Amino acid sequence: MAKPSGKSTTKKKVKKTVVDGIAHIHASFNNTIVTITDRQGNTLSWATAGGSGFRGSRKSTPFAAQVAAERAGQAAQDYGLKNLDVEVKGPGPGRESAVRALNNIGYKVNNITDVTPIPHNGCRPPKKRRV
């Protein structure tokens, strides 16, 4: 028979407070992914244009990227985040609007870096489309 225990010993999960973070914006031609991490690279929050309710060609618009950045930024504010470094990757249409949205939420954007991978003549690119 089980013993009746006097007190449960479960701990409440405490959210860590992070002041400085990095916003990684991956803007492809079809979608925009915004991930907010701490300085070590541990993910605090993320959002995508597709996950924000946009489907099809509307997913690849600057407005969809703005909504995704706002959703990721609001979720990261629970950690006490104040300062952001922004790393933008890719040629998509949502690059500038996502950075602007993070700035409008109230984050202090320290610097914006373009980390788009550029090959030094590496792999052969796919052939051009003939429509």
From Swiss-Prot:
It holds the Pfam family Ribosomal_S11. GO terms for biological process: translation. One of its GO terms (molecular function) is rRNA binding. Gene3D superfamilies: Ribosomal protein S11 (3.30.420.80). The keyword Signal does not apply. GO terms for cellular component: ribonucleoprotein complex; ribosome. Keywords: Ribonucleoprotein, Ribosomal protein, RNA-binding, rRNA-binding. InterPro entries: Ribosomal_uS11, Ribosomal_uS11_bac-type, Ribosomal_uS11_sf. The keyword Ribosomal protein applies. It comes from the Bacteria. Belongs to the universal ribosomal protein uS11 family. Located on the platform of the 30S subunit, it bridges several disparate RNA helices of the 16S rRNA. Forms part of the Shine-Dalgarno cleft in the 70S ribosome. NCBIfam families: PRK05309.1 (NF003698), uS11_bact (TIGR03632). Part of the 30S ribosomal subunit. Interacts with proteins S7 and S18. Binds to IF-3. This is Small ribosomal subunit protein uS11. The gene is rpsK.
